[in-house]
A protein has these predicted regions:
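Basic helix-turn-helix/winged-helix DNA-binding cores
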Residues: 1-60, 69
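Generic N-terminal initiation segments characterized by hydrophobic and/or small/turn-forming residues
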Residues: 7, 25, 55-58, 64, ...
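Proteins with a high burden of low-complexity, intrinsically disordered sequence enriched in S/T/G/P/A and R
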Residues: 13, 31, 38, 63, ...
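Short amphipathic alpha-helical surface micro-motifs
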Residues: 18-19, 33-36, 79-82, 89-91
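Residues in flexible loops and secondary-structure boundaries
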Residues: 20, 45-49, 61, 69, ...
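A short, Lys/Arg-enriched interface patch at domain edges and termini
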Residues: 56-88
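Terminal, intrinsically disordered low-complexity segments enriched in charged/polar
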Residues: 81-164
């Protein structure tokens, strides 16, 4: 089965994820092997098996890429994600959270006032509003896989409803 005819309702394979997120397979593999983020649907279990990622996994990977592009280390990203899981829960990706990073530290702001407060401290920071990343990912998947537009919309809706 070719990539364009793959039934993405089963999940997204590594090549699709790399295209949507804008990373190399090597990065994706490294992030999985080091425990930063692996596929939620299916791990690779030897030669010939494929990882299967959810829509939510792709959203998270897009956030990781943005933080990396801002100069944040994978160690700091991992710490921030663990902290968010502990404080907000596994559905933090659906919350109105803005992640701000100065390249060294990641701050999570849950209100516009917190964002302004962090910015007024005079630090140069890079901000990522997490919730809009859903729409960006959905749009990118629609652009890359137009034959699956309806399936992708359903996947995003299912992911948001399930909190995965």
């Amino acid at each position: 089965m070719t990539e364009s005819t793959t039934d993405i309702t089963l999940g997204f394979r590594s090549p699709q994820v790399c295209k949507v997120v804008g990373i190399t397979y090597r990065q994706l593999d490294y992030w999985d092997r080091t425990g930063l983020l692996g596929p939620s649907l299916q791990e690779a279990s030897g030669s010939g098996t494929q990882r299967l990622y959810t829509f939510q996994d792709i959203v998270t990977l897009r956030v990781v890429k943005r933080l990396k592009d801002a100069g944040t280390s994978l160690h700091k990203i991992r710490q921030a994600f663990d902290q968010l899981e502990a404080e907000v829960g596994s559905n933090w990706r659906e919350q109105d959270i803005t992640l701000l990073s100065d390249g060294t530290t990641i701050y999570a702001a849950t209100s516009p006032e917190e964002v302004v407060d962090l910015l007024q401290k005079g630090q140069g920071v890079f901000g990522i509003a997490v919730r809009p990343v859903h729409d960006e990912v959905r749009g990118e998947i629609h652009r890359l896989y137009p034959d699956h537009a309806e399936e992708v919309s359903d996947l995003g809706t299912i992911a948001e409803a399930a909190g995965t």
